[in-house]
Amino acid sequence: TTLVDAEQAREDTAALLAGHPDINVLVAFNEPTSVGAAQAVEELGLEEQVFLVGFDSNVATIEGLQTGSVDALVVQNPYAMGYLGVESAYRLLTGQAEELAPMVDTSTQIVYRSNLFSLDSQKALFAFG
């Protein structure tokens, strides 16, 4: 089941960490779970004990990178995903399937606190096409 509610992710993460104090790494695979997990880590004061990797980004997760509740973000490129997906669909519908690559890499950028303000990270976090 994929969680899409940050509050539920916060509650579940807090319960998981309380029940298993030996956990020192968390990976949250979408934006809402990244937000909720970061909130739980911060509320429990575990910024120094738990290494949290989140996917995608928003104001809350970027702030978490700055304050320490998030240690890394895997930032995808939704513009490229949408654009290249539509382009591929167009080629299929217009008989140009032979021009399609079997795999399309839309790129990701791993953003840490240490490279948060680099040009590449800023482009990934605030991409507009």
Question: What is each stretch, according to the model?
Answer:
Residues 67-79:
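Short beta-strand elements at the ligand-binding edges of bilobed clamshell
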